[in-house]
Amino acid sequence: MSDSIIAIVPAAGVGARASHPGVESVPKQYRPLAGQPMLRHAVAALLADERVSQVRVAVTPGDGWVDQALAGLPRTVWRACGGATRADTVAGALAESGVADDTWVLVHDAARPGLPAPALARLIDACLADAVGGLLALPVADTVKAGHDRVERTLDRNGLWLAQTPQMFRAGVLRDALTAAAVNGVAVTDEASAIEAAGYAPLLVPGAMRNFKVTWPDDFELMEKWL
């Protein structure tokens, strides 16, 4: 089996939750952090590990920001293969890549620009030695409540993890899992959920606090401090 690794960054969303009222409608992944677009930070974090042979960024057709955002980065290409959902975008990027089924694929959120090199190395090391692959994740530390405007119940946090990215799986397995999820109407919020639905148990690899997903307006200020 091959140890070849590529990365896919789905970057076709608009990030509505991260917008301030009245702020220019620049997609979240292109908003500046520490002087550079957030997407550029996310891609550069993947390029920090030389084992990643290429980073493929999937954008929406007509994207007018990506050329400038990623100009000059090595081992990086971008294609207008973004779909209606994250799963569609990743599936489209996989199909467009043409990689062999046994190639390892890292899928990383454009909104996680704080990925530390040691966490990425941990994930790659662990997955190369595993039959399935896995993801970065953090054990839940806070008390977890279920409810809407009022608490309905408190959940047992024992054994609960917060999924992060990258998530790393063989291209063929991931492609088949995403296809099966689409056919069967399985809700896929990350690649691991598709892999789980296909009957596999992905490896949980300790992530990092600074690898949080920039989601809300205040997250930009916090991430600036990390970067």
PLM regions with names:
Residues S2-G64:
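N-terminal glycine-rich phosphate-binding loop and ensuing alpha1 helix
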Residues I5, T76-W78, L160:
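Short, conserved active-site loop motifs that form the nucleotide-linked donor/cofactor pocket
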Residues V9, L39, A93, H108-D109, ...:
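Residue-level signal for inorganic ion chemistry
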Residues G64-L70:
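Acidic helix N-cap motif at the loop->helix transition within catalytic regions
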Residues A71-W104:
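Short phosphate-binding loop-to-helix
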Residues D101, G114-L203:
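Conserved core of the sugar-phosphate nucleotidyltransferase
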Residues L203-R210:
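Catalytic beta-strand/loop signature of glycosyltransferases that borders the donor
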Residues V214-L227:
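Phosphate-binding loop/pocket of nucleotide- and phosphate-handling active sites
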